[in-house]
Amino acid sequence: MAVTVAQKAQIVQDYQRAAADTGSPEVQVALLTARINDLTGHFKANIKDHHSRRGLLKMVSRRRKLLDYLKRTNLESYKTLIERLGLRK
């Protein structure tokens, strides 16, 4: 099941820096993490869905790039985000 509008709004509200902030790296990483977690469950049932797996790999790569940017620019925010989302590194 895809991430619903209500779930997306809740994620944005939880991770935004200021009111109406939807583009900060923290929000983008949190949204990508929700989509990645959702697709991971999809692949347990649909092992041969290679077309969607390519999209998953692109999302993981985009999340990694955003995390690298955040680590370079704001290390404290990076550390708290990694801990809140339960990601490695």
Curated annotation (Swiss-Prot):
Coiled coil: none annotated. Transmembrane segments: none annotated. It comes from the Bacteria. SMART domains: Ribosomal_S15. GO terms for cellular component: cytosolic small ribosomal subunit. Signal peptide: none annotated. One of its GO terms (molecular function) is structural constituent of ribosome. One of its GO terms (biological process) is translation. Keywords: Ribonucleoprotein, Ribosomal protein, RNA-binding, rRNA-binding. This is Small ribosomal subunit protein uS15. Belongs to the universal ribosomal protein uS15 family. One of the primary rRNA binding proteins, it binds directly to 16S rRNA where it helps nucleate assembly of the platform of the 30S subunit by binding and bridging several RNA helices of the 16S rRNA. The keyword RNA-binding applies. The lineage of its organism: Bacteria, Pseudomonadati, Pseudomonadota, Betaproteobacteria, Nitrosomonadales.
